[in-house]
Amino acid sequence: MLENANLLISTPYKLTREQLLYDLYVAFEDASRGKHKMSYVKKFEEHLAENLNALCDELLGRTYKALPSKCFIVDYPKKREVFAAMFRDRIVHHLYFNYTHQIYERTFIADTYSCIVGRGTLYGVERLRHHIRQSSLNWQEDCYAMSLDIRGYFMHIDRARLLKIATESLKKMSGHKVGLTDDVPLPSGVLLTERTTWGEVRDFDFLLWLTEQIVMLDPMENC
């Protein structure tokens, strides 16, 4: 049982090898979507079962370590340095996203958009209209918008602080109920009821470990 986790969790879920292997295949499909002609995808697909099984064993055995990232420069829309994870590690990133995005999204403000289903361009336009109406006193006063960017944001993230925020959010949400109307992928054999908590459909011990592996990896030092 997780420390400080909500006591609503009655039967904490433990990830099985069979389930993880299936979830890794789904993550592979997500990571390779639109990229099947890329050489690194083709190379991984040549021994797909072997590669996914090896990745599964590393994750279950808590021996997984990300490979060095590939560093390169892009010029459009502006010159910047990019650190690209190896394809096998992108699969792990998609796995983590699939396991956690619906959990984290419940802690985000309404104006968080990136990678959230239902919060596309139209939603953004409607939210902008709402804020303009609110700031202009229903179109009666002038209001202003400012476009900002944080220089070197991803290069200077305080990873220890981010890890603390992420793990605290996971622990807090582990005891929350899963919405019956939510499209939540469930582990094999788990039935969703009005009392089902996130801790009963996600292995939070595994997620907390994987969170640390992803968050604390600095691509600038691992390339």
Descriptions of predicted regions:
Residues 51, 70, 78, 88, ...:
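Generic hydrophobic, aliphatic-rich segments that mediate packing or membrane embedding
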Residues 131, 136-223:
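Conserved polymerase palm-domain catalytic core
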Residues 34-42, 67-93, 107-119, 191-200, ...:
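Short, conserved non-catalytic motifs in the polymerase core
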Residues 1-53:
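Non-catalytic, polymerase-adjacent accessory regions of viral genome-replication enzymes
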Residues 10-14, 97-159:
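Active-site-proximal segment of RNA-dependent polymerases
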Residues 46-59, 72, 86:
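N-terminal accessory alpha/beta regions
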Residues 95-99, 103, 169, 214:
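Amphipathic alpha-helical segments in well-ordered regions
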